[in-house]
Amino acid sequence: MNINSTLIGQAIAFAIFVMFCMKFVWPPLIGAINDRQRKIAEGLNAAEKAKADLATAERDVQQELDLAKTKAAALIEQANKSANQLVEDAKSQAQVEGERIRQQAQAAIDQEINQARESLRAQVAELAVLGAEKILQDKVDVQKHASMLDQLAAKL
C-alpha cells in the first residue's frame, strides 16, 4: 500500500474529527451517562430506603394492632366485670328489698293479728258483761265494769 497525500489528508481529518469529538461531543455524552448513573443510584437508594421504611411501618402497624387488641380485651374484661357487678348489686338490692317487703308484710300481719285479738277481747268482755247482766239482772257500775274488763282482757 502506498502512502500518498490522500491517506495523510484522511489521517489529519480523522485526527481533527477525534479532537473535535473529544472536545465537544464526548463531555456531554459522559455527563449524560454520569447523570443517568447518579439518577439510577439515587433511585436504587430511594427504593432501599422505602423498603426499609415500609418494613418499619409494617412493624409499627403490627405493634399498634397488638396494643389495640390488648386495650380492647382489657375494655371488654372491664365491661364484663362491670356488668357482673351490676348484676350482683341488683341481686343484693332485690334481696334487701324483698326482705324489707317481707318484714313490712309480717309487721302488717302482726298488727292485724293484734287488732283482731283486741277486737275479740272486747267482744268477749262485752259478751261476758251482757251474760253477767242477764244472770244478775242488775246493772254493774261502769267503773267496776271497766276494771273487770281490763283484768279479763289481761288474762286473755
From Swiss-Prot:
Subunit structure: F-type ATPases have 2 components, F(1) - the catalytic core - and F(0) - the membrane proton channel. F(1) has five subunits: alpha(3), beta(3), gamma(1), delta(1), epsilon(1). F(0) has three main subunits: a(1), b(2) and c(10-14). The alpha and beta chains form an alternating ring which encloses part of the gamma chain. F(1) is attached to F(0) by a central stalk formed by the gamma and epsilon chains, while a peripheral stalk is formed by the delta and b chains.
Gene3D superfamilies xrefs: F1F0 ATP synthase subunit B, membrane domain
Alphabetical UniProt keywords: ATP synthesis, Cell inner membrane, Cell membrane, CF(0), Hydrogen ion transport, Ion transport, Membrane, Transmembrane, Transmembrane helix, Transport
Family of the protein in this entry: Belongs to the ATPase B chain family.
Record function comment: F(1)F(0) ATP synthase produces ATP from ADP in the presence of a proton or sodium gradient. F-type ATPases consist of two structural domains, F(1) containing the extramembraneous catalytic core and F(0) containing the membrane proton channel, linked together by a central stalk and a peripheral stalk. During catalysis, ATP synthesis in the catalytic domain of F(1) is coupled via a rotary mechanism of the central stalk subunits to proton translocation. Component of the F(0) channel, it forms part of the peripheral stalk, linking F(1) to F(0).
Membrane topology: Single-pass membrane protein
One Gene Ontology cellular component: proton-transporting ATP synthase complex
An MF annotation (GO) of this entry: proton-transporting ATPase activity, rotational mechanism
Listed Pfam families: ATP-synt_B (PF00430)
Keyword NADP tagged: no
Keyword Secreted: no
Predominant location: membrane
Name of the protein this chain belongs to: ATP synthase subunit b
Transmembrane segments: 11-31
Location in or out of the cell: Cell inner membrane
